[in-house]
Amino acid sequence: RQVLALFGAGHVAQALVPILAQLPLSVRWIDNRESLTPTEPLPANVDYLCDDEPVGEIPLLPAGSWVVIMTHDHQLDFELAEKALKHPDLPYVGMIGSQTKAKRFVHRLQSKGISDGQLSRFVTPIGLSDIPGKLPVEVAVSVSAQIIRRLHGVNATEAPLTADTTKEALHDTQ
């Protein structure tokens, strides 16, 4: 199973985990707030870890793990992104946030010596841009849709299906 490390246990992560749990993933859900430790039993493919220093979990991830960052703390998000991008065996580092946050983080990461090659693994804001909405469940669906595309080997930046491309695809099969 593909390992996915999810950093953060806020509203969006809580909406995302039940979706991820139904996919062929091994989810490591990590947060530094004891108060957000789930009280209900988690699915067998989801492990929750409360860790005061979540950045220390990055080097412990198996090679090939995907990283999704959605903590409550912008500085922690930055430290997680920087550490994950410096780890060459992590092919996907996705982070929740606005376009403004994304641009600011990319600039800060570049100033810290993160190369364009390393930044090519950084997907922010995470999720499919054509799925609108700010509710936690809407963001979770958008993020999970992007993860499903990756699971199926579809480039996450590939243009989404439109009415025109769907008509063309249907025409090609007739």
Q: Where would I find each of the regions flagged by the language model?
A:
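Adenosine-phosphate binding glycine-rich loop
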Residues: 96-174
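Hydrophobic, well-ordered beta-alpha structural blocks that scaffold small-molecule cofactor pockets
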Residues: 1-63, 70, 76-80
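N-terminal hydrophobic or amphipathic segments with adjacent small-residue motifs
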Residues: 2-4, 88-91, 121, 134
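ADP-ribose/adenylate-binding Rossmann-like module
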Residues: 30, 66, 70-74, 83-109
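Glycine-rich loops and low-complexity Gly/Arg-rich segments
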Residues: 30-32, 53-56, 73-75, 92-95, ...
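Alpha-helix boundary recognition
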Residues: 21, 59, 85-86, 110
